[in-house]
Amino acid sequence: VIEEKLNEGEIERIPVEGVTVTATGASGVVTGITNEDGIISLAVIKTGEYKVAIDITSLPDGVTPQSDRPTELTINFDTGATIGSGERKVSLFVGDDRASGSGRWEQLPQTLVNGIKLSLIISMCAVGLSLIYGTTGLTNFAHGEIVTIGALVAFWLNKYGFGLHLLLAAPFGIAASALAAGLFERQVWRPLRRRGTSLTSMMIISIGVAISVRYIYLFFFGGRNRRYNEFVGTPEIDFGLFGITPRDLGIVIISSVTAIGVAVFLSKAKFGKAIRAVSDNPDLASATGINTDRIILIVWLIGGALAGMGGLMLGASSGVQWDMGNIILLLMFAAITVGGLGNPYGALLGSFVVGMFTELWTWVFPNVVELKTLGALMALVIVLLVRPQGLLGRKERIG
């Protein structure tokens, strides 16, 4: 038994556990309950015609039948229709009607809502990456792994460690990402800067670090996509033109408040002004008495915390997996390039452009949603053709 959901333009299929399924036929009535993989095995002793049906009342809260998909199927179980050693495999689908196909214009409002949500998730991850680039000049390909570790720590506490509600596990995940970012700065990047290592070499090192850490995640976490306890089968709030789950509504609200808070911090707070000063001219900032090493460490901690929050939002939206940070890394780089390299406000604006283009791509080309990242690349190309320095970037003379 599989639940179909329309998630960010793609049809997401999730196994449904605990659903009662019956097979009625020559052997009488045989009943069973699906396991955590949505699978049930029913043993029958006679060949012939069987009706396989879902007990609708056993579906989890928030999971409903699709209007255009049957919840029961009739199969002819005989030697000519068997698979393997006397087995017959049947898939039954439930879930979101929009996942099974509807008019394109009917899907546009939902696509725009998904675009806003994706934009805000990208912005949480990209602002830190932009701040790090602005203060150090480092193109950090390991930033995706900082995104991932926050989601993994929160998942472990939520699912296995203490069974904490996600709202209680989230601060630990955010702190883990901030701590990881701070350790990277103190133990890897600061020593390399003091040795005079070139930015190109440091970028290559970051690629190696990213690959190494990513496969450590795979070894301990495994390759499955998993979900937080609170977000299995959550009901959707129907607003007519579009629907949104309480989970996604929470993502939009929390991300929006955080983005506004970051913008206010950078423009009004003392540390925020110092960060912008170091980003604009590190040598001049140091000459005026600003401790640049301290500011850079603070930038890494803030960037890591924001990345951890972005990872939590991404995990709540699409599930937690070992390479989730790497999956969104291209969108992060596209966002900070579109907005203007090293400009955190540009990262926020660029994230909106990239997120909306990515989701609208799936609306314009619904049959090639696997290539949805092309939407982000198209946004990048179009903006750079018009403004090579990015939307909020500054022109600089080269050579």
Model region roles, listed by residue range:
Residues 27-43:
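Short, acidic Ser/Thr/Gly-rich low-complexity loop/linker segments typical of extracellular
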Residues 243-320, 349:
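Helix-loop-helix "hairpin" substructures at the membrane interface of multi-pass membrane proteins
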Residues 2-26, 36, 47:
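Short, ordered, surface-exposed loop/turn motifs in non-cytosolic proteins
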Residues 79-89, 291-294, 365-399:
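Cytosolic-side transmembrane-helix boundaries in multi-pass membrane proteins
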